[in-house]
Design a protein with these regions (language model features):
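Conserved structural position within tetratricopeptide repeats
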Residues: 61, 92, 111, 143-146, ...
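Helix-start (N-cap) detector for alpha-helical repeat units in TPR-like alpha-solenoids
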Residues: 65, 118, 152-153, 186-187, ...
């Protein structure tokens, strides 16, 4: 270990240089082990020992590609409500691997951000919506929104209920409530666009789809919808 003395100060290169490199290596090393082993609990434990969610959030925006990928993955396991917006920004990262990891973590935290009781109720509503049982999902979704009004995903699921029941005005209102609480919720932008299309608001639908793609460039279905709308417009104008 090299010691440097200057004006009575005793500083070591280990303290000024090596320590930050060790912290960096711990995260990337844990990430590489995870890619080989797929042992998520071990990865989470290794990262949690040395990194706070705030530090991971910083690395998500400032680290190199591997560091950003590792941070995005970690935040899905160790993050909290304050991690949702940074992950939402990372959905537009130049690296596709970062975008994919951020998307998985973003969706996980949207579902997990509420209290455990509300989380379980949301999972029930999601299960009903996924099965197309929108009428059965409506009442528990409305109760959940009333009990946990800050829970963005609850508003999203309520919007899906209304949309499935072809009540597009109520669905529009619920999608807006979701986006008011989480502006990076790109599935809500896409759902809102579908409502506006059904209500004949083509320009607004296009704007919502473009916002969806600005947030998450990998939503190919939104890109296809934009092309279809523009193609129909050209055919109508002709």
């Amino acid at each position: 270990m090299l010691a440097i003395e200057n004006r009575g100060l005793h500083i070591t290169t280990e303290e000024t240089v090596t320590s930050p490199l060790v912290r960096t290596t711990r995260l990337t090393s844990a990430y590489r082990r995870f890619l080989t082993s797929a042992d998520a609990p071990r990865f989470a434990a290794e990262v949690d020992e040395f990194y706070s969610p705030a530090t991971l959030t910083t690395l998500l925006s400032r680290g190199d590609i591997e560091m950003r990928r590792a941070s995005a993955l970690s935040l899905g396991m160790l993050g909290n409500r304050s991690s949702i917006e940074p992950l939402g920004r990372a959905l537009g990262d130049p690296d596709r691997g970062v975008r994919l990891a951020s998307d998985d973590s973003f969706r996980a935290l949207l579902v997990r951000e509420a209290a455990p009781l509300h989380h379980q109720k949301l999972l029930k509503v999601m299960h009903l919506n996924d099965g197309g049982e929108h009428a059965a999902a409506l009442a528990p979704a409305m109760i959940l929104v009333d009990q946990a009004p800050k829970y963005a995903e609850a508003h999203h699921q309520l919007a899906i209920c209304w949309q499935g029941l072809e009540n597009y005005y109520q669905a529009e209102s619920a999608y807006r409530s979701c986006l008011w609480r989480c502006r990076f919720h790109y599935p809500a932008w896409q759902g809102l666009a579908r409502c506006w299309l059904m209500l004949g608001e083509t320009d607004r639908a296009l704007s919502a789809l473009e916002l969806c793609l600005q947030i998450c460039p990998d939503v190919e279905s939104a890109r296809l919808q934009i092309r279809a709308i523009r193609r129909r417009r050209r055919q109508t104008d002709a």
